Amino acid sequence: MTSVPFAGERRGDAPLTWGQRAIWEAIQRTVPDDHYFNFGRVIRLGARPASVDGARWALARLVERHESLRTLVEDGHQRLLASGELPIVLGDDPDDLLAELAAPAYDYAREWPLRAGLVTSGPDVTHIVMVFCHLAADGLGAEEAVRDLRLLLLRGEPRGSRPPQPLDIARWQRSRDGRRVAAEAAAHWEREHRRIPPTMFYVPSEAGADPPIWRASLRSPAIDLAAQRIAVKHGTSTSNVLLTAVTALVAQMTGHDTVAMLPIVSNRFRADTRGAVSTMAQEGLFVLDVEKVRFDELLALARPAALRAYRSAYHDPADRARVLAEVSEDRGTPVHPYCCFNDMRFADHAVYRDDVLIRRALGETSLTWPMSQDQLNCRFCVHVSGTMDVSVTADTRWLSRPEMERFLRGLEDLLVEAALR
């Protein structure tokens, strides 16, 4: 174990940003399994290894540049500290070190939201491991941090001017312009919540497992190839293809004619959020009336619904909570979809794939069960990774393990059939 001191330019306090508030509420609902939200990056230094002192220096400059990495959260507020010392763990294997650093839940009020580790070979650092508290960064925020760290190691300085910081984002969100954006989003949440079913998975499965939360992961090159072919054919993104397909299957499994999904949206479309090492991603509200039409026709109907969902994602969670409480009271029942979609890929490039290639890829599909735990803040979450692993994390009290597998196999069947039609 070693450490490195850092000294930033300012300190301060502010309410949580909308993105921080959203993930803070999810964390609170997931305790004691909130380590679920920790995530990491392994930076392989390759042909240009660093010295231990050089890696320590770069990590210190990174924490000084990005204030989220020295921000603590306590009692619903963020507290930015100017200086401190970052612990750095030494290890022999990057994957083992990543697992070690990611395993414990964070102490959000006392622990720096970045855990760092170095893998060495003799005097050289071959890998740098970073594990982020989700209050400090989301996936795209972590990529910004990785790019800056590489530039610090290579050139001694990061790129560009000072990036957006959480304190400044929080202050804008409380401004008149920020409240106008929040009000527009709240109107969408209220309008749609007055017409959607109270929740998506509403019939107990009668087959709850112990522990109740499980993840099924389908590695399917066929889904990847089929989604690309459909996206090119219809002039859309593979993410929209997958969101529409998941929605269609939820309708099929639940019997709902109107389906509400909560896609995770990056919220990095604005100049004052782009480039921030912070948690900007939030849930949008995607609502689709699933008609008795073919999948390609449903895809056309989904496009404007997706745009509305993306706009609604940049919202104040306090407004959303108020809207849900008011609508639930008016309707006489709790209203919440508990049905999420998270495309975690950083790029969405589609090529028109040959049908022979798609059919051949069907033989490469495999299913695993990589995770189980006691608590989750949702009933049904679909994740799409960069390796085209499509997973379902679900509460088996509402969707049994056989139903989870049936969903994933059905998703592959639907997309392949639509691609080859």
Regions found by a protein language model. Give the residues of each.
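A short, small/polar-residue-rich loop/turn motif at beta-strand boundaries
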Residues: 3-15, 47-64, 76-113, 295-306, ...
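Active-site-proximal acidic secondary-structure segment that organizes catalysis
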Residues: 91, 114-167, 403-417
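His-Asp-centered acyl/peptidyl-transfer active-site segments
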Residues: 12, 29-39, 56, 67-68, ...
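Gly/Ser/Thr-rich phosphate-binding loops and adjoining beta-strand/alpha-helix segments
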Residues: 3-13, 33-54, 109-129, 206-270, ...
